[in-house]
Amino acid sequence: SFFKLCGQLMELHEENKFKVRSYTNAAFQISKFPDPLEEMDPDYYGSIPGVGKSLIPQIEDLLDTGRLPYLEEWIEKTPKGVIEMLGIKGIGPSKVRVIWKDMGIESPGELLYACNESRLIDYKACG
């Protein structure tokens, strides 16, 4: 979901932990909510657990335009391959940050190459 990716990117860039938690929690709650957002009256967005006042305008933007400008800002700050690494099972934003920032690896292909060379063993977050 848009909000899950936004939370992951915020964590990757070490954004405020409370903001990160807000986005990831909202993503989880929205995914578990029985009604699709598109079918809900906008007045009820706040009734979804975990969706606070600050996220409601973003939900409205997303439904009106199909875009989430706040997410797009985070995407612009992040190499495409790093975003792709967030989709690898078992590797969360914290490990991806170490792989990217400390090791200079910016794609799944580079990560595979580093694994084959056993370069990840030396890093606490990866070993």
Where are these regions (language model features)?
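Double-stranded DNA-binding cores of transcription factors and transposases
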Residues: 1-34
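Accessory alpha-helical DNA-binding modules that contact the DNA backbone or grooves
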Residues: 21-126
